[in-house]
């Protein structure tokens, strides 16, 4: 007696049996132009598409088994599909993830219909009212244009505005520069400035070197007419620096678009968004530098991310988990 095939196995065999095959994917657009036939909706055109389809099938199968106890794809109804998508929405999935699932369900119905000779319909609708709005300004970086907007709005410099400008180059935490003194800055040739940070996060002492004319001029103005032991930012505190930036961003109308339909835009805030911007700029600069030196794209990316980790003050261990958060922050 043959072994009973699981629901996921049925999906998997249907996907693997797609005529395009995962060994010789064809280009979707060239396929249409060459054959001059209507699009065949069951076709899978890439390894990525196949992987996403298998992921959807796996999650969907688990839900159907738990909620409905069914064991055959022919037993799946459109109501069951909608129930699963609603469940995903209520669980906190983003709008983009839900749209991806909706599209994959439709593709799955075409795939199983061809493989098993069925006439299923897995069409669903993403109900926007069920999507939890998790839009958070903490997830975003300021864009280069927004940084320039804030710079242009500064009429009367203060400790908070000076820190904002400083951090847009160095990606420093406020806590890292609270005790920074004028003598901790060393000016070199070709507009190079080396910043010495003592007892940073984790008890590390470290240096940051920035070679930029604008930054050089800023640092010169910060130490002008001050004693070497004077605080560079006059005893700045995190709360005051963030309040200054938040007020500025609010006046300029710098917002994050809501991830849900009809959701309200949220104002960007916090100097952490400046830190994310600065490290993205630095990582890209280092990546380009390593490419010019002859490294492969993968090697250049790896080395640039290590440099970025050091610049952030997380050491030379190359914390990919931390770097990913900073580099993936959208603007």
Q: What name fits each language-model region?
A:
Residues 187, 288-327:
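Short, polar N-cap/turn motifs at the start of nucleic acid-interacting alpha helices
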């Amino acid at each position: 007696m043959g072994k009973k095939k699981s629901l996921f196995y049925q999906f998997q065999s249907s996907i693997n049996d797609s005529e395009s095959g995962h060994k010789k994917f064809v280009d979707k657009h060239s396929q249409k132009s060459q054959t001059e036939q209507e699009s065949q909706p069951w076709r899978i055109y890439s390894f990525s598409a196949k992987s996403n389809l298998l992921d959807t099938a796996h999650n969907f199968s688990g839900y159907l088994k738990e909620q409905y106890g069914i064991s055959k794809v022919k037993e799946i109804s459109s109501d069951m599909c909608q129930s699963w998508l609603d469940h995903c929405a209520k669980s906190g999935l983003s709008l983009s993830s839900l749209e991806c699932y909706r599209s994959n369900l439709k593709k799955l119905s075409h795939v199983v219909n061809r493989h098993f000779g069925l006439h299923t319909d897995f069409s669903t609708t993403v109900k926007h009212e069920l999507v939890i709005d998790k839009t958070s300004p903490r997830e975003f970086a300021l864009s280069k244009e927004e940084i320039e907007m804030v710079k242009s709005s500064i009429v009367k410099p203060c400790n908070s505005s000076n820190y904002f400008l400083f951090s847009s180059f160095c990606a420093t935490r406020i806590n890292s520069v609270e005790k920074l003194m004028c003598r901790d800055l060393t000016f070199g040739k070709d507009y190079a400035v080396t910043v010495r940070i003592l007892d940073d996060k984790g008890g590390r002492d470290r240096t940051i070197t920035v070679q930029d004319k604008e930054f050089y001029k800023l640092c010169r103005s910060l130490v002008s007419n001050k004693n070497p032991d004077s605080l560079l930012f006059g005893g700045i505190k995190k709360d005051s620096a963030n309040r200054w930036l938040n007020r500025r961003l609010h006046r300029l109308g710098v917002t994050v678009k809501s991830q849900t339909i009809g959701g309200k835009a949220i104002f960007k805030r916090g100097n952490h968004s400046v830190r994310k911007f600065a490290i993205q700029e630095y990582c890209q600069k280092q990546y380009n530098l390593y490419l010019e030196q002859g490294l492969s794209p993968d090697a250049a990316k790896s080395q640039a991310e290590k440099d970025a980790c050091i610049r952030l003050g997380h050491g030379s261990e190359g914390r990919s988990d931390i770097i990913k958060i900073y580099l993936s922050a959208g603007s």
